[in-house]
């Protein structure tokens, strides 16, 4: 795939998606203050973001409501308390995990909802169920995207088949390249993005990227993908997200050349909310343990536990992670 634009060029097809509440919610069990959420919404509108992901549409039969904040479930009334009828250009989205969302019960018709987009997330082994969910949501009137998770552990043949099935049989408008473990390097991202774009363009779809920062490559991987034609770019304020976090909103807003995007509202939000959140002890961001799991292409759950235990025995951890019996 040829490069699509230069670093200083303007790309009208680019869409910036703020995932702070959803991916960041994995850090603090979605316990955000009303002021935080309302100010985040206002900041995204002012910054020119295209989409704000409010959280998960998780099943209350699968997850105990008392264990999480409201953005784990994203009830319609809770979103409307923040956005009203959302008379802005910012679109509202939620994520629905295959097998963890009672989608036929909890996803109401678009005509009754302020939500614009459902972001379905699946693993390679649940593609048929994902297609069913995608098409159901599309038939209810929503825009739908699909995140294929943990692709760094899938075989080339599995990924090729998954992409073809999703592109040909689902009504998703965007297929996301997801670096779940933060293990991929820019050269790999370029090759994968090329693969995704070729399939997507054949079926009239777009491609997005959701990067993790285990090896401090989330921003680099995002702009690498963007350069060759990926258009939906996921970010979070100060990179807030599970484990090592994600691509920083501040970095991407400083990079993009589209005059509709403004960095000042992002910086003001970071100053008001993200700095105090860090000082209050909410932990995320790249650290040695996350680098180790990313380098080993492993889920960060062990690094998250390492962090929670206050450990600093990095060499022992590295030996544990890389030992094969």
What are these regions (language model features)?
Residues 1-325:
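Catalytic cores and adjacent flexible loops of soluble metabolic enzymes
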């Amino acid at each position: 795939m040829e490069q699509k634009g230069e670093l200083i060029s303007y790309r009208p097809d680019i869409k910036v998606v703020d995932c702070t509440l959803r991916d960041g919610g994995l850090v603090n069990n979605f316990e955000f203050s009303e002021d935080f959420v309302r100010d985040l919404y206002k900041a995204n509108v002012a910054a020119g973001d295209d989409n704000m992901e409010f959280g998960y549409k998780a099943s209350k039969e699968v997850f105990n409501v008392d264990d999480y904040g409201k953005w784990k479930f994203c009830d319609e009334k809770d979103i409307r308390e923040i956005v009203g009828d959302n008379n802005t250009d910012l679109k509202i989205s939620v994520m629905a995990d295959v097998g963890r969302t009672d989608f036929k019960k909890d996803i109401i018709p678009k005509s009754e909802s302020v939500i614009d987009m459902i972001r379905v997330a699946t693993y390679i082994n649940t593609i048929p169920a994902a297609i069913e969910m995608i098409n159901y949501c599309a038939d209810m009137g929503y825009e739908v995207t699909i995140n294929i998770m943990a692709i760094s552990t899938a075989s080339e043949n599995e990924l090729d088949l998954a992409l073809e099935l999703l592109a040909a049989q689902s009504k998703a408008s965007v297929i996301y390249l997801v670096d779940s473990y933060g293990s991929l390097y820019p050269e790999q991202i370029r090759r994968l993005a090329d693969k995704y774009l070729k399939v997507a363009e054949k079926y009239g779809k777009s491609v997005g990227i959701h990067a993790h920062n285990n090896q401090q490559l989330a921003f680099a991987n995002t702009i690498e993908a963007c350069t060759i034609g990926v258009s939906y770019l996921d970010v979070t304020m100060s990179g807030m997200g599970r484990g090592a976090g994600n691509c920083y909103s501040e970095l991407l807003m400083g990079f993009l050349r589209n005059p509709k995007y403004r960095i000042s509202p992002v910086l003001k939000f970071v100053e008001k909310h993200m700095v105090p959140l860090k000082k209050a002890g909410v932990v995320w961001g790249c650290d040695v343990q996350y680098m180790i799991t990313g380098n080993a292409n492993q889920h960060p759950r062990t690094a998250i536990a390492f962090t929670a235990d206050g450990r600093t025995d990095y060499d022992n951890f590295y030996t544990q992670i890389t030992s094969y019996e």
